[in-house]
């Protein structure tokens, strides 16, 4: 993950998304400078991050004074106004911040940000919505992680016909074109990573499977 390699972050815009990113990065042990023009937003995270400052990031002199150039990565969480987030992104790139990650609200917004040099653009609301919909559409699914458009990892309850079968007998790879990478015993049980061929599936188990999205969907429908 990009966040593990880098150690110092500037987070600009402390709405729900920005403040969540700032506090989480801080709790993971990174140095975080949090910036917002609203004093109440800054106060909300002040105790939880390394530095919290009230300032207008649209003004390049403010960013220079804060020394943002010395940070590994900037997260622009000002998603509601294309003009503001574009201007801030441009400022950061011109000042020389190595990596700039931006939040966008739409595909048009994303295109604008990529054109002016954003290294990565995320759609938090859209991504959460997609994950929620995938979870709701299958009552079996406990968790779904999209690795790319075509591949994913899913944790799903095992179908009845798998009970008391060994992983070898199930031959999941040949039958369903997915790989079982772990099994969780019982609802809150321990995760058995890379279970052996002789592992017996029991009622209440959940499997963590890796594969193409279409094959994973088929597995969930069992």
Regions found by a protein language model. Name each.
Residues 1-222:
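Cytosolic regulatory regions of ion transport systems
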């Amino acid at each position: 993950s990009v966040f593990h390699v880098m150690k110092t972050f500037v987070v600009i815009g402390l709405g729900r998304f920005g403040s969540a990113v700032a506090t989480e990065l801080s709790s993971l042990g990174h140095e975080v400078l949090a910036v917002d023009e609203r004093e109440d937003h800054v106060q909300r995270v002040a105790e939880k991050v390394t530095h919290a400052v009230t300032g207008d990031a649209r003004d390049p002199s403010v960013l220079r004074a804060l020394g943002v150039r010395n940070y590994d990565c900037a997260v622009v969480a000002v998603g509601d106004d294309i003009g503001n987030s574009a201007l801030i992104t441009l400022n950061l790139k011109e000042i020389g911040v190595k990596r700039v990650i931006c939040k966008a609200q739409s595909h048009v917004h994303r295109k604008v940000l990529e054109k002016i040099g954003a290294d990565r653009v995320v759609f938090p609301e859209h991504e959460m919505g997609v994950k929620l919909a995938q979870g709701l559409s299958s009552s079996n699914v406990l968790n779904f992680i999209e690795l790319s458009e075509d591949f994913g990892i899913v944790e799903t309850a095992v179908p009845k016909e798998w009970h008391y079968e060994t992983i070898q007998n199930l031959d999941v790879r040949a039958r369903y074109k997915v790989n079982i990478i772990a099994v969780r015993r019982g609802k809150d049980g321990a995760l058995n990573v890379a279970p052996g061929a002789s592992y017996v599936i029991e009622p209440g188990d959940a499997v963590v499977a890796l594969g193409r999205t279409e094959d994973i969907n088929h597995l969930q429908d069992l």
